[in-house]
Amino acid sequence: MVRISRRRLLQTGTATIGTAGIAGCLGQGGGSLDSITVAYVPIYPNMQHFVMQKEGYYDELSIDVTVERFSNGPSLVKAFASGDIDVAVGGLTPAMVLVDKGTTARVLTANGRNAFKVMATAEIAELYEQAGADAFEQFEAEQGRKIRFGAPPDGSVPDIVLRYWVERDLGIGEFESAVTKSKINPAKSVQTIQSGDIDATMIMEPFATIIGRDQTMAEVEWSGNIFPGHPMTGMFVNQQVREATDVVRSLVDAHVEATQFVESNPTTAAAHAASIIGSGVSVDLAEAAMGSQAADFISDPREIVDQTETMSEYVSEVGNINEPIATENLFAFEPYDAVQE
């Protein structure tokens, strides 16, 4: 976990490093909101966060902002649930898990939608192009085994989209009976599929772009065709931040500005993403991924509500939450509406 502390430029006239720790994030005993901790996972769909950090949008808030990096979603969820972070830039399904377990988490903005591609061996891609949904049965008949998919853990956003594709879009039966799934970290998907340990993956950018450059691999489908408008990540906050009207409106306003920045300055935004993500994501790769259908960045939370409800049903079915989460318990629309007035 990496921590970067900043202090508002407009207050001090210079950029200084804040020293507020987690214990002082929200003041004690219900006091005023003096500072917030923003946590993120360094994945490409969190593009607005990279812009907000590199372009100094967090600096322009009226409070101290501490930015913390988490290596994965589960660790971010644990920190949010324990009160160690106040604002999270992460997946919508982790937010559902938090709410299900009694932690207040309200989604203020979307980050993106339609964020995955099904990448597979060229053999499977060709078979799917010819046979469609029947490709799964044909492959098993020819190879004596099911297609092996690699994807993050059950209940994650890509896992849910993969299940939706198999069960609802293609209608080929229950997920577990149709494919064999291995749980893999997205960053390891390229190595895993190229080594032959899996046949296909539901994967985000820029890893889809890397796999697509391999002539032995090909794109099978885009998640925007599978589950149109499905969410990926968003910005969600705890109750204390939610009640700080000026702060949440400022956060949402900065997010909207970041989305506009991505649209008008995609090359610079890609460079910002590469500089923060690291881990083999070069500027050239980040720029190339900007041209992908799976790079669709938005802020308006209402654009993903219906799809999030469907996704919540699936998260419940795999057992990550007890029951689907009601929209009013997951989203807070007022801040976005206010900055649009």
Where would I find each of the regions flagged by the language model?
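A conserved helix-loop-strand patch within extracytoplasmic ligand-binding domains
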Residues: 111-184, 239
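Secondary-structure end/capping motifs
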Residues: 245-321
